[in-house]
Amino acid sequence: MTTTTTLDLTGLKCPLPALKTRKALGRIKPGERLEVRCTDPLAAIDIPHLVGETGDRIESVTREGDGLVFLIERRIVLEDRQGQ
């Protein structure tokens, strides 16, 4: 069973959703998932950009009410990627 951690960033504005998502991704293990809930419209750009930088994968993006829910799979550890 895959572990999913939920990060509720509702009400936070740029750049906080991306910064908090990066920090949370650093705390979970490869293979685990992070569910990010946010209402900042810029998160639609910032979160996918962040995930591209970290080498992780967005499994899904859904609209819920006035916000977005990202489901992100942790793929590699940031420190490992820096050495490549």
Identify what each model region corresponds to:
Residues L9-V61:
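Amphipathic, hydrophobic secondary-structure cores in small proteins
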Residues P48-Q84:
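C-terminal structural segments of small proteins and small subunits
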Residues M1-T2, E73:
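Short, compositionally biased "basic patch" segments
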Residues T5, L34, L68-F70:
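Conserved beta-strand core positions
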Residues T2-D8:
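Right-handed parallel beta-helix/beta-solenoid
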